[in-house]
């Protein structure tokens, strides 16, 4: 997870407590919330469930 966090930061994403705008990401345990700049809604990656979930 640390490698992914470092990579996202290098790509210009900003770590925050709450993902509210494009370019934000947040980490809580094995869950990564990410708002890609080219998407209308953020996504959630649950590394324990091994699935990608869009959320609004």
Task: Identify the role of each PLM range.
Residues 1-56:
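ASCE RecA-like P-loop NTPase motor cores
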